Amino acid sequence: MTKLNEEESFLEALKTRKKWVNDYLKKDYRKELFIPQDIYDGVFSYLRVSGKVLRPSVLYFSCGAVGGEESLATPAAVAIELFHTWTIVHDDIMDRDKLRRGSKTVHEEFRQRALDTGKFDQKEAYHYGVSVGIMTGEVQHGWATSLLSELY
């Protein structure tokens, strides 16, 4: 196998595992509990534009390397992705980042939504955006913990 074929094969393997993670996220019953709508939108904002899902893929590959059925590792893989995502949401707040992967950060998106209502001044809109961002991360953290607690 050539180096290019190996790289293509690896990227295809990553796509497959990313699909497993995304399919699980779409079907998990817990997402119906994420209310109000702003929290739901915040929880899924980074997950919709996620990268290669490397961390969960490492878990899948490790499972397969020791003879396990990779797809059975999906709840743990999803928990890893959620855990990583909530730390990014909180990191963006701490660093006061306004963009992530070319899109607005969670807290910036909700700051802007608050301003767009015409009911918030700059200070209150900023507070609202940060509050939704923190709650978004906390919901993702709880979701990850819930998935891990069901593994045994």
Language-model-detected regions and their locations in the chain:
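Mg2+-dependent prenyl diphosphate-binding active-site environment of isoprenoid biosynthetic enzymes
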Residues: 29, 33-152
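N-terminal amphipathic/basic leader segments beginning at the initiator methionine
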Residues: 1-29
